[in-house]
Structure formats: C-alpha cells, structure tokens
Amino acid sequence: MIDTTPTESNLSGLDKKAFQKNINNQQTDLYILKNAQGMEVAVTNYGCALLSIMVPDKNGKYANVVLGHDSIEHVINSPEPFLSTTIGRYGNRIANGKFTLYGEEHQLTINNGPNSLHGGPTGFHTRIWNAVQPNESTVIFNYTSADGEEGFPGNLEVEMTYRLEDETNALVIEYRATTDKAT
C-alpha cells in the first residue's frame, strides 16, 4: 500500500529519491505532472510505469486511484512485472513464441510457458526510457528497440506521452512508433 501523505513536492507522498537509481549507466527517475485543477500524476521512466493518479473527491479530499508502486525497487522486483508499466513490443501472448511475417519465421524470447507474453522478459516494461518534461503537465518518453530485441525484426523508435488536460481533467496517453522494417 502506498502511503498517500502529501509531501511538499507532490500529493501522492512518493519520495523522488526512492525512484532514482543507476542501472547499467542509465538513471531512473520520478516525474510529477500537475494540471490547473489540482490533478496530479506520478510516473517513472523505468517501464513508463504509472505510479499514482491523485484526484479530488466531491469534498476536495485527494485519493490515489491507481494500484502503483512506492519505489523503483518495488517496480523492478514486483511479483506482477507488468503492473502499471508499458508493455511491448506486443500486448498479449504470441503462441509458441513464433510468428511468420512475409514468409519469414521469427522466434521470440519465451516467458510464459511456451509463449511470448507482452514483449518478452525484457520488454518495454523493463527498459529505462529517455524522458523530457517540457512543462508541468506533460512528460515525453522515448525508447529505441533494436532490430532483433526479444526476437522482433526492425529497429523501432517509440514515443510515449503522458499529458494532463486542464479543461477535461483527463490523463491522455499517446503512443507513436516508427520502424525501418516490417515488424
């Protein structure tokens, strides 16, 4: 259970230092998004995990409406590795970890019995994404999945944006991807 005692910097009570870790010369971090209506979202660049969504109830009391994590260690070592993270390159199972594309068979990394699940054991959910926070309500994550990663063909450039809207008080999540090969 996440302690939702507000801190000076965020409503969720999450400690920024608990999300800062150097892993293979890459730095993980915590990003707090806020909008004009007081809504707040916390995310990390490790797997683009959504950690908290703090919204006010009808009495103005804030509550977290997401089952998230309270530290980077909890994200990394969770018994549910896909909980609150971004999965990929593929969502769901690929039977026997194989698929044929334009007559060429591709063998994927197996991580769910005989199958490949949610992009494999080191899919997007385990990657440290580059992050840019252009303003208080937006963070943009980027990741390059190399040709052959987890068995998938093609270099894949992925951009994921979390944005809080002021007027609708909505969290918008946008995905964009381009590849240099059929995948």
PLM feature spans:
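Surface-exposed acidic/polar loop and edge beta-strand patches at domain peripheries
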Residues: 2-183
